[in-house]
A protein has these predicted regions:
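Active-site-adjacent pocket scaffolds in enzyme catalytic domains
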Residues: 1-78
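C-terminal domain-boundary segment and adjacent tail
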Residues: 63-152
Length: 152
C-alpha cells in the first residue's frame, strides 16, 4: 500500500475475529515485505473499545469503561484512540434507542480528557501523528548516495 498510516487494528478486542489484536497501546511501523513501493506504514492501534461494542453490543450505560481504560493508557504513556460511529449516536435524546446511544457519552469522554489531562495531551490528526512517529521514533538511517534521505 502507498499509505502513511493505518488505523484498523485494535490493541485487543474480544469481539473481533482476531481478539488478541496487536497487543500494544503504542504506534508501530509495519515494514513493506515486498520489493519496491512504499517502505511501509505506521499503524495507529485503536486502544479504547469502539462505541458500537460498548453501547450496542454490551449494553453499557455510561462511558466509565472508556475513562478507566484511558487512565490505564495514560499511566503507561500510550496512545488513546477510539473508533466512534456518529451514525449510532442519538443527538436529540438522552436515552437509548434501537441501535443508538446518547451522544453525551462521547461528550463526557472529551470533557474528561480536557479536564483531567489538561495541558498533558496532544490531539493531532492521524497523519500528523504518523509523521511525528516516523520522524521521532524510527531509527535514523544513513543517507543514500546522492544525499537524499529516504524513509526507513
Amino acid at each position: 500500500l502507498e499509505t502513511e498510516y493505518d488505523a484498523s487494528t485494535f490493541d485487543t478486542d474480544p469481539f473481533e475475529p482476531q481478539p488478541q489484536g496487536c497487543r500494544t497501546i503504542f504506534p508501530f511501523f509495519v515494514a513493506n515485505q515486498n520489493r519496491g513501493g512504499a517502505p511501509g506504514y505506521v499503524e495507529l492501534p485503536y486502544t479504547l473499545p469502539q462505541d458500537s461494542t460498548l453501547y450496542l453490543l454490551l449494553g453499557e450505560r455510561t462511558p466509565d469503561i472508556w475513562l478507566r481504560k484511558l487512565d490505564w493508557i495514560v499511566q503507561r504513556g500510550g496512545l488513546a484512540l477510539v473508533n466512534i460511529h456518529p451514525d449510532y449516536m442519538d443527538f436529540e435524546r438522552s436515552d437509548y434507542a434501537a441501535f443508538r446511544y446518547p451522544a453525551s457519552h462521547v461528550e463526557d469522554l472529551l470533557d474528561y480528557v480536557s479536564t483531567r489531562y489538561r495541558d498533558e495531551f496532544w490531539n493531532p490528526l492521524p497523519k500528523e501523528l504518523a509523521a511525528w512517529f516516523r520522524a521521532s521514533c524510527l531509527p535514523a538511517r544513513p543517507h543514500p548516495p546522492g544525499g537524499a534521505a529516504k524513509l526507513p
